[in-house]
């Protein structure tokens, strides 16, 4: 388990003086954001607090906003589906293409255990995000290269993405879009050899239909003089 800065971010709603309040434990993925996700079956509210108007989960208002918040309207998550918002950053513009982006989607994987009941979606950097992205045909935006560094479209080109967290948070703060950046303790994968943080990273992959070549593999395996013999009959011969 590690303690890291999470981000509670204000996403400006299109055509309204209001924000969708969303949470993420990976601030470095925010430049690649293309959607926000709510749970279709949970209760959400439009609420005012300290001069701002927010959309968020009803159950988390007191935890996130504290006392004094005034609820204006009630919704089910599914009522917010397709509500549009303005992008946080312009860096993904060329990668969006003609696909629709920057709107609210729904999925039951969103929980109310932590955060705001709204999570940001970057399909290139998570299994749940990827599934939601495919279902809604969201654009694939990956502003991190295969070395794990932020790409040239961003101001942090060449920086290892995890080390870009604080710079991304500062950029949001400068835009008055960062509501909070609390420390959050969670399990995070690290390399077992060098203890470097790992990232979820979508990439093209080859898959081989082994049933089509199984008999050839067994026949060729039987021509090999394996020492010890059990390796050939076991690990390489057991199909």
How would you label these PLM feature ranges?
Residues 32-146:
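Catalytic alpha/beta core of large soluble enzyme barrels
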